[in-house]
Amino acid sequence: YLNRFESYLVSCADELYALVEQINHPYVEIMFDTFHANIEEVSTADAIRRIAKKTPHIQLSESTRGILGEGQVNWPSVLQAIKDVNYSGWLVVEAFSEKLPAAHIWRKMFNSERELVEKSYQFLITNYEKI
């Protein structure tokens, strides 16, 4: 789902889960994005726990759309929730760079894609192992 500033259909995990349940089709599931959840949810971790069974794809995105761990997302609780639900779907890092014109990025969030990948990966591995 998207946050309330980018969408009017649904803007939180519970609304999206209810919509997916109402559609009731095996090909309609949830793609969860921590950037939007960080705006809309009281607890991103609790939202993950509530919708996990209908969520085959989670986009891990920092509040700045930059390197994971360098913003305001509560990663320990998010990673704990992912572990708690025995999540086995896709975990994808989503970040925006100046190379994506449609994102209207006006400042650099990382120096290179390589830095983004290396630092975000190391952050995830290090912090997931702590749980």
Regions found by a protein language model. Name each.
Residues 10-32, 37-131:
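Histidine-acidic metal/acid-base catalytic patches
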Residues 2-8:
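Surface-exposed cleft-lining segments at the edges of enzyme active sites
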Residues 1-2, 95:
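Residue-level "edge-of-site" marker
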